[in-house]
Amino acid sequence: MSVSIVLQPGQVTLAQWRALYRGAEVALDDACAAAVLRSAQTVEAIVARGEPVYGVNTGFGKLASVRIEREDLQALQRNIVLSHAAGVGEPTPVPVVRLMMALKLTSLAQGASGVQPDTLALLDAMLRAGITPVVPCQGSVGASGDLAPLSHLAAAMIGVGEAFVGAQRLPAADALAHAQLQPRVLGAKEGLALLNGTQFSTACALAGLFEIETVLQAALVTGALSVEAAKGSDTPFDARIHALRGQPGQIATAAALRALMADSAIRESHRLGDVRVQDPYCLRCQPQVMGAALDVMRQAARTLEIEANGVSDNPLVFSDTGEALSGGNFHAEPVAFAADMLAMAVCEIGSISERRTAMLVDPALSGLPAFLTPRPGLNSGFMIPQVTAAALVSENKQRAYPASVDSIPTSANQEDHVSMAAHGARRLLAMAENAAHVIGIELLAAVQGCDFHAPLRSSTALEAARALLRAQVPTLQDDRYFHPDMLAASALVRSGALAQTVAIPLPGVEQDV
């Protein structure tokens, strides 16, 4: 199998995590082997000295005061994996689990967790062979790490549970055998190292970030199309306005809207003599709303990139001094905050998009035929797609309630404050999907609105977007079964095709226009 990304522990870029999520093949940088071996040898030395170290020769959680005999250390590590593999719910999507595996791999490879080189090699081999453990999506409170989801990963490594090989769902032992791999017998600390950490929450949050970024870029295109359909003004996007405020996301999104609308004949047709003084906020304030969403997404991205390159195990092994120190890096509060920010961003992206669709279907606001149909009354046109958009936006509003402000004590009050990062991060994919449908509906409505202005044409960029949609969805003349049209439009949003077809650099979490 060819490798397109080499993971360098502690130095993996956001672009590399995105590529991995999108299906790129990966392998671990061999340069980490020495640090991993030193870390494992440090744990062996601690065991030989007989000094008590949490999770190495003690029980777990509230049972940390129980000493474990040396001959039982392998059983201890197997037991923690089996007992903690207690997740429920639907399997986590394979791309997210692959992200989780890679995050765990690069964390362990930094040589602070005490795992054996062969354990790391097995995880690397599973990732490269396309063996993806079945990981139930529910059961983590985000401290002490993502115990249940990561335990299902660890269980597959010891031949327990299930795993996907391609589309096949197999017993984990059979999945390993499929690639001529042997289950591991875990040594001191290895089970705890595999299941302690924030990798599940971080993987879900990164997946959400990447999907929401795609949604935001598509929404800039549909927002510009809506301005054209309503014969709105591009004056609110003037660079001088946004420079005076200085918000970077606002400046970037305004620049994108200007570029998207450049050379539009529709815009020029009403530049002079338009009696309207100002457009509705949903058109005029796009840079302020979308820019704020972009800034929040960039802040979340920075947090997640740091987390993805960090070590969130406990205890941590310091080979230079021969110590294993107990701390709290497993507490996923940074991830929870980032997930909450992303939830707010995608909620607002969808919210202002729905308002534009509502504006377009209202002839009093848009100047277009009612519900964008040539014969309103006989036909209902876009009446109910706008209702669907409203329903999805309201669903996202409910989901946007911050998860990080919730906490519930666990493990007999030993683990008495938790982050709820997994809950906050898991919702993001569903929220992004809802928003993609909302923006897909706006795409249909805005292009339909532009069709009423024929023979006038929009800008080069927006005409490319119109052509992309019209290749799959014809202009609505009379009512037809709407569902396939909506699915086709949302697919253009989610795939990134809509943002790519305009051939203009659109702002994302890593770059400006």
UniProtKB/Swiss-Prot annotation:
Pathway: Amino-acid degradation; L-histidine degradation into L-glutamate; N-formimidoyl-L-glutamate from L-histidine: step 1/3. Keywords: Cytoplasm, Histidine metabolism, Lyase. GO terms for cellular component: cytoplasm. One of its GO terms (biological process) is L-histidine catabolic process to glutamate and formamide. It comes from the Bacteria. CDD domains: PAL-HAL. Coiled coil: none annotated. InterPro entries: Aromatic_Lyase, Fumarase/histidase_N, HutH, L-Aspartase-like, Phe/His_NH3-lyase_AS. It catalyses: L-histidine = trans-urocanate + NH4(+). Its EC number is 4.3.1.3. The modification 2,3-didehydroalanine (Ser) is found at S144. There is a cross-link at A143-G145 (5-imidazolinone (Ala-Gly)). Its main location: cytoplasm. It is found in: Cytoplasm. Gene3D superfamilies: Fumarase/aspartase (Central domain) (1.20.200.10), Fumarase/aspartase (N-terminal domain) (1.10.275.10). One of its GO terms (molecular function) is histidine ammonia-lyase activity. Contains an active site 4-methylidene-imidazol-5-one (MIO), which is formed autocatalytically by cyclization and dehydration of residues Ala-Ser-Gly. Belongs to the PAL/histidase family. This is Histidine ammonia-lyase.
